[in-house]
Amino acid sequence: MFSKADRPVLFATFVLVSAAICPTPAAGGQGASQSHEREALGHGYARPARSPHSSRSEVIAPHGMVAASHPLAAQVGIDILKAGGNAIDAAVAVNAVLGLVEPHMNGVGGDLFAIVWDAETERLYGLNATGRAPYELNRQVFERQNLDRVPGTGPLTWTVPGAVDGWDQLLTRFGTMGFAEVLAPAIAYGRDGFPVSEIIQGQWAASERSLAEWPTSAATYLPNGRPPAVGEVFKNSGLVRTYEAIARGGRDAFYRGEIARTIVSFSESNGGYFTMPDFEDHSSVWVEPVTSSYRGYDVWEIPPNSSGIVALMMLNILEGYDIASLGHNSAETIHLITEAKKLAFADRDRYVADADANMLPVAELISKEYAARRRALIDQMRASGTVRAGDPTDNAETVYLTVVDKDRNAVSLIESIFGGFGSKVVPADLGFALQNRGSGFSLEPGHLNSLEPHKRSLHTNMPAFVTKDGKPWLSFGVMGGNMQPQGHTQVLSNIIDFGMNLQEAGDAARVRHGGTLQVEPGVTDAVIAELERLGHRVRRAGGGGMGGYQAIMIHPETGMLHGGTDPRKDGMVIGY
């Protein structure tokens, strides 16, 4: 037995076997060779026959687990747990590291949502840590500039960053550590540097031209006049100073101190509309997660302005079909998922907005009765023609993470600056980009999501949690703009309808509808032909856009933690 101090860390491991490792065929010839081959297969070097969707196992561990989109961040979370911190402490530490190592995806210039399972009270808590539009920004500003929509980048897209206040709310209510402890690993990596991975480098390079338009952004993210190369060590002294200020002064250092004053001063000089009251008046909101059941499992999401109810609407519609009998990624299954998505997104575009500014019919939208009425609109033999044209929220960059600790506290957290490097603007020398979440507003007067001063925009982000018989079962999320509700639906169907484990559920081929139906490799040519016969416009997916997934399950029988992560990103699950 291992003592508490020297328990081994459990890693998901790939084993590559070269021919030199295998025994040389015996003189007996083919029969001996086949014997050795059977022996090698018997020792586990072949993919299990039951796992056509995955090339690696779930991670399984007894004590604590972290699933994050970057290995360094996941390891930091485990270090926090082993140092005596709980899941909430670890989640904030992981998020801070992700803001450094995946700066195009997230950071303190962005917003977050979280769902917390508190083991002591045995209930879920939701946190909406999203920011609002500046007090001085209104639709007339855009009219004077002859703009009929909010741009995708620049100062007119800025909303107050909510992440730091979200961290403070999480640590104050449920954490055991302070900012100095949880930010220390990110500060160290920012000062000493970290090597840039291949996936991140490619996404970083895609924003080179727009980052170069802002001298402060270029100084931060284009060292030596270019994006870092694969394997090159990147340091961020500006973000280190920002994190150190938060570590010393807490959330007020960001919203009432020098950081806020620097952002406001930069805004005033560069065509923005931020004022100090925008930051001083900012606060996160604890909310009741909303829920609906899917085949006996209770699925929990954050209410609007999050898009969480969209996944619940899709699942409610699909529950009326025997999906398992139709087959995984069959034409029939993909058709139903796509048609459910069209209906749910039509409702999202009409009803998902800032709940503080609108009366929203959330309970009605996620009711089984409403789902039955919407389901009746689906023609199982023909694709509907009601396809939304154009979507300003489609290019979203986000990180999702989840942590479960030894006491079975759990956190499901998603954080984002929206587009790649957000607004593309780094304020002064603070070391992070401000989000472009304001581009999610409509400029249509009377629309529930219409831009107003001090209002939250529609958010694509949505962490999720699943309980079974009142007990915590699954903490998961699928980052990636409008893929999120579609990803939640497909992952849960993979697990519940098709019996996949967490790794299989994430690795399996996905589909995404956004006018055209994109399908990943693994969807057969015959299925594509049948989908086209039904009236769908189909193309093979390429270049990303299918989301990134992390999940941790608390096994209801053994109590063990099972984890899965997405091969589409640099994700890693680590347990101990």
Roles of regions detected by a PLM:
Residues M1-A12:
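Bacterial N-terminal signal peptides that target proteins for export
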Residues F11-P23:
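Bacterial N-terminal signal peptides
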Residues Q30-Q75, A87-G249, F254-R256, A260-S306, ...:
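Noncatalytic scaffold domains of N-terminal-nucleophile
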Residues G44, G320-I417, L430, R437, ...:
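Internal maturation/activation junctions in enzymes
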Residues I80-L81, D165-R173, G249-R256, R261, ...:
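Alpha-helical support elements that line or immediately flank enzyme active sites
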Residues L100-G107, D111-G126, F274-T275, N409-L474, ...:
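Active-site rim segments in enzyme catalytic domains, especially the processed small/beta chain
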Residues W286, N395-T398, H459-N461:
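Short, small/polar residue-rich loop motifs at catalytic or cofactor-binding pockets
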Residues D407, K455, H488, D497-G544:
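Extended C-terminal subregions enriched in glycine
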